[in-house]
Amino acid sequence: MLSKKVVDLLNNQVNKELYSAYLYLDFENYYHDKSLEGFANWYHVQVQEETAHAQLMMQYLQDNDYSVVLEAINKPNIPLNELSDPLKAGLKHEQYVTELIHTCYAAAYEEKDFRTMQFLDWFVKEQGEEEKNASDLISRFELFGHDAKGLYDLDAEYKTRTYIAPSILQTKN
């Protein structure tokens, strides 16, 4: 049995993951409007990943006989004036999500909820990867994105990124 505190935090996390998808849709749209289809694709894949994260949290709650409470998703309010703005905002957001996952994990630990801790282990690892990917995007943009050829090459590379469902999601079907 999960504690009310853990259930509430996991429900909150479902909504934060859905907000993440919504935020990355905004970034995808921004790059599409700038005719940078590769950068748009990179964020399109992020949308799919964040949606999968929400689905995993939802499934965990449902598998443990708890209802999922979906909240309204706020409109992203991040000024996007420079090509690097979504990249920087994306890293900051991933760092925020990492803090949220750690809060869920800490609550599960306090409650001696080892099953939830084991479930969240995947998210802890995933957030490390998400932060590294976001940081690498910024680094590569700073190195190569300030001239037309470099930006063109980065954009072409990011067009090839594809979504791969998390293995723990693939086993749910």
Enumerate the predicted regions with their spans.
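Iron-associated oxidoreductase/ferritin-like identity signal
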Residues: 1-173
